């Protein structure tokens, strides 16, 4: 599969209109970090381009772009991408749905994994946990707070919930043993060393975070950015998105 991935990169590189290597500035949500970690270096080796990537919460990154932050390609949630489209900051023909990621529960590597196979089991796991780390400011954290309220667990979990700045830091908190459970999009937690995926949330209460890309309408490296976007969507790279806990092109 790795050979196919590199072959896809080489083919895409041949399509590029750029005469020489370029620095592609990418503003990317934390949820796509794991995919970028694997496919980014492959694209760089195959094309000679360099990816200059900054990560963060989609909502925060969207505001930065609205405030004038320059970029060539951005990967955010649909609300941010669509808002930027309306403002003319993203090329209208470049909006691309890359993948979606369900939310999952993590524990420290080697720790016992609770049963979360049903809604009732999931509720028991939350109640029995000593502490639960989550990113409250992101789309997933906002959903989780609402879900806990719908499940009638707000009071039971009030002293157990540990708000953490973002998904990756949530995973790091669990990896250090400072929280027993962590709940984030699966695509974010799989990028963190020292944690293990317990499983996705039960289907009845699952929530999906969609990763959507767009090329800047004022991109300094527009052609190279579009080449990288094509590379991310190449059939030979679908397996990487799946391995990182996401569904491609959802």
Predicted features by range, described:
Residues 1-8, 18:
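Bacterial N-terminal signal peptides that target proteins for export
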Residues 12-20:
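C-terminal segment of classical bacterial N-terminal signal peptides
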Residues 20-67, 75-101, 106-250:
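Exported/periplasmic ABC-transporter solute-binding proteins
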Residues 2-5, 13, 162:
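Residues at the start of alpha-helices and the adjacent loop-to-helix junctions
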């Amino acid at each position: 599969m790795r050979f196919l991935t590199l072959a896809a990169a080489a083919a895409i590189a041949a399509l590029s209109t750029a005469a020489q290597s370029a620095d592609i500035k990418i503003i990317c949500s934390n949820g796509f970090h794991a995919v970028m970690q694997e496919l980014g270096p492959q694209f760089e080796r195959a094309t000679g381009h360099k990816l200059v990537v900054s990560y963060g919460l989609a909502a925060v990154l969207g505001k930065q772009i609205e405030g004038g932050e320059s970029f060539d390609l951005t990967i955010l949630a649909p609300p941010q991408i669509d808002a930027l489209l309306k403002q003319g900051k993203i090329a209208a023909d470049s909006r691309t749905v890359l993948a979606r990621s369900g939310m999952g529960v993590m524990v420290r590597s080697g720790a016992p994994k609770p049963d979360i196979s049903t809604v009732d089991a999931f509720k028991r796991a939350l109640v029995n946990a000593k502490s639960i780390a989550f990113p409250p400011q992101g789309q997933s954290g906002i959903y989780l707070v609402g879900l806990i309220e719908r499940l009638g667990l707000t009071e039971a979990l009030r002293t157990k919930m540990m708000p953490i700045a973002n998904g990756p830091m949530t995973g790091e908190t669990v990896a250090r043993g400072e929280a027993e459970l962590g709940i984030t999009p699966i695509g974010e937690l799989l990028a963190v060393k020292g944690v293990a995926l317990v499983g996705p949330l039960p289907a009845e209460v699952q929530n999906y975070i969609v990763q959507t890309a767009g090329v800047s309408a004022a991109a300094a490296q527009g052609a190279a950015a579009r080449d990288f976007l094509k590379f991310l969507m190449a059939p030979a790279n679908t397996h990487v998105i799946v391995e990182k806990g996401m569904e491609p092109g959802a």
